[in-house]
Amino acid sequence: MERRDFFRIAAAAGVGTAAQNPGMAQATAPATPPTIERATSGQPSKGKVFALITPHLDDGPIFAGGTIAKLLNEGYTGYFIRVSNDEKDSYNLTLGETVLANEQDAAQFVEVAGLKKRYDLHYRNHGLDDISRMEIRVRLIFLFRLLKVDTVLSYDPWGHYEENPDHYVTAQAVEAACWMSADHLDFPEQFDAGLKVHAVSEKYYFARGPQMVNRVVDIGPTLKQKIAYIRSCRTMITNMVRSTNDSLAAQGMRIPAFSGGQDAAKDAYIEAAFIERDKQVGAKYGLEYAEEFHYIGPDHSLDEYIRAHAERI
């Protein structure tokens, strides 16, 4: 996920609205107001498993970091599936150095967040549209069955105006894998390895562009955790800050907060580029900070019929 031009565009326009800031998703109003999901006390989700599946390290922390923290706080076991090798996202490193630096940062994110494990699929960054989607799908189905994933967080497979093929290829592979992992005729050879069919029952989809938002998560209680997650993406955030400074300098401008010590500059950038966005999203729903999703939950279509007609055998 790239944010290099965030302040170049905002500075050129002289404003900072959602329409002008890349990555600020535009909510398309659903037929009914979105559900507000708030923190729950205790650990009601103990025993449940989620997988964060994104092409790049920083996608999850930026777009769903508060929600990831909420799920973990409520008892979920979490896994991170990183689809690409993130070889394109650094400021002044070689390709090989970039792969290593982002791999180390990914390990740091997993540790900071308290996720159980990371799986890297190692496809080349910005090249997922040249990879068989079936291949990615099969690997995800294997992991969903192996880990018994209940909930996924990923890009919206139907998000509009997405310019990065890594994002929509990953999203569509995730959507298909969620469905097919529950089918006994999809890749049955996996059952000989001890796996069983497994249905993914919940999906939190985020987007950089317009999206049908039907779920809003209150991340006020988990904002500090989200900031820590984003900070762990050190190589990528450094790239964003320094590229923004270069772009501003080319226009004869500077932002003092981005020009200080490295850590202070990164914190200022995180606040301006990401946390301010979450604040704007929250304000729309009477919350301090929030994240928006298209949420697909469990299928309850037969619940009433089962309650009325099921009998013990």
Where are the predicted features?
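Active-site rim/loop-helix segments in enzyme catalytic domains that contact anionic ligands
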Residues: 3, 7-9, 29-147, 302-306, ...
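N-terminal export signals
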Residues: 5-27
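C-terminal accessory domains and tails appended to enzymatic cores
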Residues: 7, 33-37, 42-46, 183-196, ...
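Structural signal for conserved beta-strand scaffold positions within catalytic alpha/beta enzyme cores
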Residues: 52, 82, 120-122, 154, ...
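Histidine-centered active-site/metal-ligand motif
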Residues: 56, 164-167, 233
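Internal alpha/beta domain cores that form substrate/cofactor-binding pockets in large enzymes
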Residues: 79, 118-203
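Residues on a specific face of well-ordered alpha-helices
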Residues: 104-108, 171-172, 176, 224
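Flexible glycine/proline-enriched surface loops and loop-helix/loop-strand junctions
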Residues: 156-158, 208-213
